[in-house]
């Protein structure tokens, strides 16, 4: 077992609703925020950040909110994030925000510019009809284009990401061109993860042969060092090189009372212990691959997702009942 060091701690409060219902939502958004009241969360975060920066020098500590950036008092929220030293005080993921017309989009972007936002990111699931179905909201595609146009006018740079599957791969070339024309600084292709509702996309996970539908330009936007076929990963000597750990503290209505009575470091140590218990319950990747791997498998994965896929199969076969540290709606961890 490799030595794991906690290198970052993120505190989150999932108290802000998302206006989409995306098919692969990492946070399995179901219309009901799990976080605690905003002000209560900020007070606790301020104490935790102060304690953790003193106790864990050299460990990066940050604060964020979700499910979307559609905070009812977004300007004040951004000022709070800046005061707490959060990276999201300069970068926003602009998915799942409320419907706005062109004028309202301009007002939003002008406010973001004034508050020091330097970069935005948009996730686009396909061309208009497909995107709207995938996002679970009619008009979402057009909203993203309005927001991109307003960001461009306000002088805020933005990037775009396209999660590609068997369903939308043949739309990708056209979509890449549209996003670049809209002013996207970069366009990245990625394979959806297996976590949250991502596991429901397994039947349409991209395979190596599907890449022939992409132009050379679009194909170059998918990092094939990160995304490889199962066969390619299994041919690597030791593909899982996990030495770093991020601890996630999620302030929720079902834990905030307890967290308020405890020191930040005691909560972090509790989650670190849960992380160790979770990962020690499984054989290593090589053993899991012997049991569940397909040496000829052509589906594309990040190694993290393939590892997660094997662990899920092992847990089901052995009826494991573990605290799921990979569920990002609750306090947990992520290794890399």
List each language-model region with its residue ranges.
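Accessory C-terminal segments flanking Radical SAM cores
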Residues: 223-324, 336
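Active-site-adjacent beta->alpha loops and helix N-cap segments on the catalytic face
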Residues: 71-77
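Short, acidic/polar
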Residues: 45, 101-111, 170-176
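Radical SAM enzyme [4Fe-4S]-AdoMet core and its adjacent flexible, acidic
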Residues: 28, 34-36, 125, 133, ...
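Aromatic/hydrophobic pocket-lining residues that form the small-molecule binding cavity
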Residues: 41-45, 74, 105, 144, ...
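N-terminal pre-triad scaffold of radical SAM enzymes
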Residues: 1-28, 49, 53-64, 248-253
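Core AdoMet radical
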Residues: 9, 29-41, 53-71, 84-103, ...
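Acidic (Asp/Glu)-rich catalytic clusters
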Residues: 48-54, 78-85, 107-117, 149-153, ...
């Amino acid at each position: 077992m490799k030595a794991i060091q906690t290198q970052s701690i993120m505190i989150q409060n999932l108290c802000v609703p998302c206006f989409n219902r995306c098919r692969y939502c990492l946070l399995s958004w179901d219309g009901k925020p799990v976080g605690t009241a905003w002000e209560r969360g900020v007070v606790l975060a301020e104490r935790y950040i102060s304690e953790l920066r003193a106790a864990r020098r050299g460990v990066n500590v940050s604060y964020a909110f979700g499910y979307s950036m559609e905070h009812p008092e977004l300007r004040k929220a951004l000022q709070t994030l800046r005061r707490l030293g959060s990276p999201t005080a300069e970068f926003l993921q602009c998915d799942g925000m409320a419907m706005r017309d062109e004028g309202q989009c301009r007002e939003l972007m002008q406010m973001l510019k004034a508050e020091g936002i330097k970069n935005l990111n948009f996730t686009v699931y396909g061309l208009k009809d497909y995107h709207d179905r995938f996002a679970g909201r009619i008009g979402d595609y057009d909203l993203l284009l309005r927001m991109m146009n307003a960001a461009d006018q306000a002088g805020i740079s933005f990037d775009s990401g396209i999660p590609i599957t068997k369903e939308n791969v043949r739309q990708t070339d056209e979509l890449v061109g549209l996003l670049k024309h809209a002013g996207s600084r970069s366009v990245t292709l990625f394979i959806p993860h297996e976590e949250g509702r991502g596991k429901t996309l397994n039947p349409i996970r991209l395979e190596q042969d599907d890449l022939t539908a992409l132009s050379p330009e679009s194909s170059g936007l998918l990092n094939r060092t990160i995304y490889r076929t199962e066969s390619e990963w299994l041919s690597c000597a030791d593909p899982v090189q996990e030495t770093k750990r991020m601890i996630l503290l999620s302030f929720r209505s079902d834990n905030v009372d307890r967290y308020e009575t405890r020191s930040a470091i005691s909560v972090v140590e509790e989650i670190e212990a849960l992380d160790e218990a979770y990962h020690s319950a499984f054989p290593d990747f090589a053993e899991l691959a012997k049991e569940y791997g397909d040496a000829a498998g052509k589906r594309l994965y990040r190694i993290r997702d393939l590892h997660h896929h094997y662990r899920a199969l092992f847990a089901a076969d052995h009826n494991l009942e573990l605290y799921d540290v990979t569920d990002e709606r609750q306090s947990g961890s992520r290794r890399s």
